[in-house]
Amino acid sequence: GSIPCGESCVYIPCITSIVGCSCKSKVCYKN
């Protein structure tokens, strides 16, 4: 939840979810 993954999730889900990132406030974050 605190580390930006450098990916947005406005239109599509987080591709970085495979490395533990999740969508919060239209941006993908890890932890």
Swiss-Prot record:
The keyword Signal does not apply. Probably participates in a plant defense mechanism. InterPro entries: Cyclotide (IPR005535), Cyclotide_bracelet_CS (IPR012323), Cyclotide_sf (IPR036146). Keywords: Disulfide bond, Knottin, Plant defense. This is a cyclic peptide. Contains 3 disulfide bonds. Disulfide bonds join 5-21, 9-23, 14-28. Belongs to the cyclotide family. Bracelet subfamily. It holds the Pfam family Cyclotide. This is Cyclotide mra3. One of its GO terms (biological process) is defense response. The lineage of its organism: Eukaryota, Viridiplantae, Streptophyta, Embryophyta, Tracheophyta.
